[in-house]
Amino acid sequence: MLYNLLLPHIHNSHIANLFHYITFRSGLAIIITLSISFVTGPILIKFLRSLQKYGQPIRSDGPESHKTKAGTPTMGGIMIILSSCLSTLLLADLTNKYIWITLFGFISFGIIGFMDDYAKVKRNNHYGVRGKSKFLLQGIISLIIYVLLEYLDKNFSHLLNVPFFKNLSLDLNYFYMVFAIFVIVGSSNAVNLTDGLDGLATVPIAFTAGSFALISYLVGNLIYANYLQLTYIPNTGELTVLCAGLVGSCLGFLWFNAQPAEVFMGDTGSLSLGGVLGIISVITKHEIVLAIIGGLFVIETTSVILQVYYFKATKGKRIFKMAPLHHHFEKHGWAESKVVIRFWIISVIFSLIGLSSLKLR
């Protein structure tokens, strides 16, 4: 909004001219989201405590240390969605189609997560909305997003770019629709599975969002895209502002989510954040790079898939003491803080590997 209001005055005002730069607005987005989080956090937590008698239900088969988390409110993802959306509406170019499509997906996945959190709190168990119903809703939202991209972007490509290789792209043609939906839904649920310890998912999400802030900026800039031999996609640079807002909102949320957590993001936060990262990767044509940068999410999801299939195939045997993987290490005696920090380190490594693909070809 501010960008659109100040745009006519960029040649007459130094301040207005600053808003012409994506980098300035992105930095401002981080400051604004942090400020909103710090101000609204205590108010929201108090409000959620008053509404949730028992807080987020704690799994009875989980690590013993988790019993101390009983009574901690959930749905803290509302704080992340609120601050991110407000900063984007304030600072991004509101004539940009990618901004509106991404915000639509972000909020829609947040609503699905809210429904799941509400069901858990109301029933006082950790089951929530049925898995099939959740997948169906996520699939429908992802399909709508894909149709919007196809309809609003006449040059929307079905090519799948392969990182670390020059000019290597696979034309998925009509299958790209299925692939795009898989990326968005998969990303949403992968982040959701990772969000099992205080602060565990928050920092890797911030790393991933920060990485895609850079990717969006480079892909949307003709000079940089040509230099790095990336697929140039006009107008994607504005997503940098949104990604920067996600970084700030995650850091702001971490202030309250660090161990011992005062609030959990819940599915409201994890499904929406995972979904929005998937959407941005599809728009910027960096779907495989998302799997690299978000490698921690992939590992956590894979551990669950392996555990479930092995359990069924062997009629009761397990590969891990508990899945997702972070619980396995807890069961091995690792302190929660050690698991979280070591997983953060792994996330940094994956982010660096993913970003290196922009240059190493």
Curated annotation (Swiss-Prot):
GO-annotated molecular function: metal ion binding; phospho-N-acetylmuramoyl-pentapeptide-transferase activity; UDP-N-acetylmuramoyl-L-alanyl-D-glutamyl-meso-2,6-diaminopimelyl-D-alanyl-D-alanine:undecaprenyl-phosphate transferase activity
Catalytic activity: UDP-N-acetyl-alpha-D-muramoyl-L-alanyl-gamma-D-glutamyl-meso-2,6-diaminopimeloyl-D-alanyl-D-alanine + di-trans,octa-cis-undecaprenyl phosphate = di-trans,octa-cis-undecaprenyl diphospho-N-acetyl-alpha-D-muramoyl-L-alanyl-D-glutamyl-meso-2,6-diaminopimeloyl-D-alanyl-D-alanine + UMP
Regions that span the bilayer: 28-48, 74-94, 99-119, 133-153, 168-188, 203-223, 236-256, 263-283, 288-308, 338-358
EC class: transferase
Pathway noted in the entry: Cell wall biogenesis; peptidoglycan biosynthesis
Subcellular location: Cell inner membrane
Record's GO cellular component terms: plasma membrane
InterPro entries: Glycosyl_transferase_4, PNAcMuramoyl-5peptid_Trfase, PNAcMuramoyl-5peptid_Trfase_CS
Biological process according to GO: cell division; cell wall organization; peptidoglycan biosynthetic process; regulation of cell shape
Highest taxon above the source species: Bacteria
Entry cofactors: Mg(2+)
Keywords assigned: Cell cycle, Cell division, Cell inner membrane, Cell membrane, Cell shape, Cell wall biogenesis/degradation, Magnesium, Membrane, Metal-binding, Peptidoglycan synthesis, Transferase, Transmembrane, Transmembrane helix
Entry's EC annotation: 2.7.8.13
Signal sequence extent: none
Membership in a protein family: Belongs to the glycosyltransferase 4 family. MraY subfamily.
Functional summary from the UniProt entry: Catalyzes the initial step of the lipid cycle reactions in the biosynthesis of the cell wall peptidoglycan: transfers peptidoglycan precursor phospho-MurNAc-pentapeptide from UDP-MurNAc-pentapeptide onto the lipid carrier undecaprenyl phosphate, yielding undecaprenyl-pyrophosphoryl-MurNAc-pentapeptide, known as lipid I.
Protein's recorded name: Phospho-N-acetylmuramoyl-pentapeptide-transferase
Organism: Rickettsia prowazekii (strain Madrid E)
